[in-house]
Structure formats: structure tokens, C-alpha cells
Design a protein with these regions (language model features):
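A short linear-motif detector with a strong N-terminal bias
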Residues: 47-49, 94-97
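Short beta-strand-loop-alpha-helix junction that forms the active-site gateway
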Residues: 81-94
Length: 181
């Protein structure tokens, strides 16, 4: 599944990068170049893999892998590609709640308020696209969460586990054994 998701990302990114050549007013923007041209000196480019760029924001201690940035009809959008099962995809009506913090983080880091989510049904490659406009309130709320988290980290105290956190959210967490105590 991971490899098929990666393959789908690469194919979509490649298709987007070729749109301008066939007359569509859509340009795939190199993220590292965008960071440099916009003088986003607070961001570190940690690497590239195909179209994706690994970025690190030291002040917030956040690293992330950006699928891309597109410029469509003169406007910039952060591109975030998601693949999902037919069951989730069929009922998809907007950006998943689980993806809001991710979009908000990317928006803060890249200075772009609009995120284009492209959800692909991994069973038949059908697609749905949604634009999420990240508001100042969303950014303030996320920064508040990061600050709270940093306080726990600096005090070497694990934060209380939120009641609504899913098991999936804990899968790659370095502290999941501490939470179970």
C-alpha cells in the first residue's frame, strides 16, 4: 500500500508538472526554489525525493514532507495528495478533520493560505479535489497547541493523552509507551 501511494503521488505530481506544456494555466512550483525565492530563511530544505521536498522549521521544531506547490491561474496553492480506500473516498465531502492541522502547519510554514487537497481513490484512481482556506484563527489555534506541547517537552513531562485521539495517531509516536503507563 505504501508503495502504491508513493507511485500515485509521483504520477499525479508528474501530470501536474506537464500541464503548462499542454496549455493549461497550471505550473508545478519547485518547493525548494519557492523557499529560496520567497526568502523563507526560517525554513531549512532537508532534502528532495522526486517532486517532494523535506522541510524543517526550527523555531517550531516541525519537519514535514511537502507534496508540492502549484500556481494555478496566477494563484499559489500548497498541494497535498491523499490516497484512500473506496469506502472513505465515496463518503468524502471535504477535507478530512485529521488533515486540518497538517494543512494549517504547512500554511504557517510556507506563507500560503490555500491548500489544494487531492484525494484519490486507490481502488480505481478516481479523484476529488477540495481547497481549504486556512484562517488566522486556525493558525493561532495550531500555534497554541505547538506552544503547549513545547512546554511539556521542555519540562520533560508527557502531556495528557487527549480522549479523542485515535490509535492510528499513536502509530508512529515516539512516546506511545509513556502514554500507556
Amino acid at each position: 500500500i505504501c508503495e502504491s501511494g508513493t507511485d500515485r503521488h509521483e504520477r499525479i505530481q508528474r501530470a501536474v508538472s506537464q500541464m503548462q506544456a499542454i496549455g493549461i494555466d497550471c505550473e508545478y512550483v519547485d518547493v525548494a526554489q519557492f523557499v529560496q525565492e520567497r526568502e523563507l530563511n526560517y525554513l531549512q530544505v532537508r532534502g528532495k525525493s522526486g517532486f517532494e521536498t523535506k522541510l524543517y522549521y526550527p523555531e517550531l521544531n516541525i519537519s514535514f514532507l511537502c507534496d508540492g506547490i502549484i500556481k494555478y491561474k496566477g494563484k499559489y496553492y500548497i498541494l497535498e495528495i491523499k490516497t484512500e480506500s473506496i469506502y472513505k473516498w465515496q463518503s468524502r465531502e471535504f477535507v478530512a478533520d485529521d488533515h486540518l492541522n497538517q494543512a494549517t502547519t504547512y500554511s504557517i510554514c510556507l506563507g500560503l493560505d490555500d491548500v489544494l487537497f487531492l484525494y484519490e481513490n486507490r481502488d480505481n484512481c478516481d479523484k476529488k479535489a477540495y481547497i481549504l482556506h486556512v484562517t488566522e484563527d486556525m493558525k493561532a489555534e495550531l500555534l497554541k497547541k505547538v506552544e503547549e506541547c513545547d512546554t511539556y517537552v521542555s519540562n520533560l513531562i508527557p502531556p495528557p493523552k487527549p480522549a479523542d485521539v485515535s490509535k492510528k495517531a499513536c502509530t508512529y509516536c515516539s512516546y506511545k509507551t509513556v502514554c500507556k503507563k
